């Protein structure tokens, strides 16, 4: 049954959905890695696809940018389409010089300046953490593929253009590995509605050094991250 933001039919989505922010990255993942691909939704050009990877049914759909957009799609996928596992695959900015551009970060927890989880947790601080079984599966896949990765906290920012750059110093002191815009909201939605979620991101730019990747590279590369996530997804 269609929702206000997804026009897929019942049963169109697999139990596990890879969840990039960019709908064109969703299209790239589907066309590059999946077989027997079918586009299942296109409302507002937020594209979603279902296919198979090594014989296992997998879906991929864009989430848009930021916690509000991500939360809408995550909620509808879980509540209306019965999705059980949502794995964000995207990009982030690095803060520490110990983290390099193109490193893969697995977000065990997500700090945030958003109030969204306080709204769902009666004004209290909610510990936005990933599902351990998803984390374990992705770490195992990374180890088997020999992919370099880091596990730790990310920061989900409400503002891309921050008015408070000194906050980066605090994040580095507290060992936050990367800054992105969705994970804290995704983890909250998953907990609220009984699903599992994980955030896996590749460092696309470095806040300290100024090194960055191009928009084309962000859209169509970072294949190591996608491959290790898919390898984990078929074990769930």
From Swiss-Prot:
The record marks 218 as: Important for catalytic activity. The active site is at residue 205. It comes from the Bacteria. A purine D-ribonucleoside binds at residues 5, 180-182, 204-205. Phosphate binds at residues 21, 25, 44, 88-91. GO terms for biological process: purine nucleoside catabolic process. One of its GO terms (molecular function) is purine-nucleoside phosphorylase activity. SUPFAM superfamilies: Purine and uridine phosphorylases. Keywords: Glycosyltransferase, Transferase. Coiled coil: none annotated. It catalyses: a purine D-ribonucleoside + phosphate = a purine nucleobase + alpha-D-ribose 1-phosphate; a purine 2'-deoxy-D-ribonucleoside + phosphate = a purine nucleobase + 2-deoxy-alpha-D-ribose 1-phosphate. InterPro entries: DeoD-type, Nucleoside_phosphorylase_CS, Nucleoside_phosphorylase_d, Nucleoside_phosphorylase_sf. Its EC number is 2.4.2.1. Transmembrane segments: none annotated. Gene3D superfamilies: Nucleoside phosphorylase domain. PANTHER family: PURINE NUCLEOSIDE PHOSPHORYLASE DEOD-TYPE, URIDINE PHOSPHORYLASE. Belongs to the PNP/UDP phosphorylase family. Homohexamer; trimer of homodimers. Catalyzes the reversible phosphorolytic breakdown of the N-glycosidic bond in the beta-(deoxy)ribonucleoside molecules, with the formation of the corresponding free purine bases and pentose-1-phosphate. This is Purine nucleoside phosphorylase DeoD-type. It comes from Shewanella loihica (strain ATCC BAA-1088 / PV-4). The gene is deoD.
């Amino acid at each position: 049954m269609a929702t206000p933001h997804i026009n897929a039919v019942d049963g169109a989505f697999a139990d596990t959905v890879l969840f990039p922010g960019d709908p064109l990255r969703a299209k790239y993942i589907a066309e590059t890695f999946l077989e027997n691909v079918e586009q299942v939704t296109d409302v507002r050009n937020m594209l979603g696809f279902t296919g198979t990877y090594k014989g296992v049914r997998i879906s991929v759909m864009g989430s848009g940018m930021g916690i509000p957009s991500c939360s809408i799609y995550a909620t509808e996928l879980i509540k209306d389409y019965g999705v059980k596992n949502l794995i964000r695959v995207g990009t982030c900015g690095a803060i520490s010089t110990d983290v390099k551009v193109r490193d893969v970060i697995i977000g065990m927890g997500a700090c945030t300046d958003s109030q969204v989880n306080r709204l769902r947790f009666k004004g209290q601080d909610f510990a936005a953490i990933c599902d351990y079984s998803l984390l374990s599966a992705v770490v195992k896949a990374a180890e088997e593929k020999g992919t370099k990765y880091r596990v730790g906290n990310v920061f989900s920012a409400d503002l891309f253009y921050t008015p408070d750059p000194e906050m980066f110093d605090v994040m580095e002191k507290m060992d936050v590995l990367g800054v992105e815009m969705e994970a804290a909201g995704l983890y909250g939605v998953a907990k609220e509605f009984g699903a599992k979620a994980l955030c896996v991101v590749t460092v696309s730019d470095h806040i300290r050094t100024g090194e960055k990747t191009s928009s084309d590279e962000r859209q169509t590369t970072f294949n190591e991250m996608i491959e290790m996530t898919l390898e984990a997804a078929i074990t769930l």
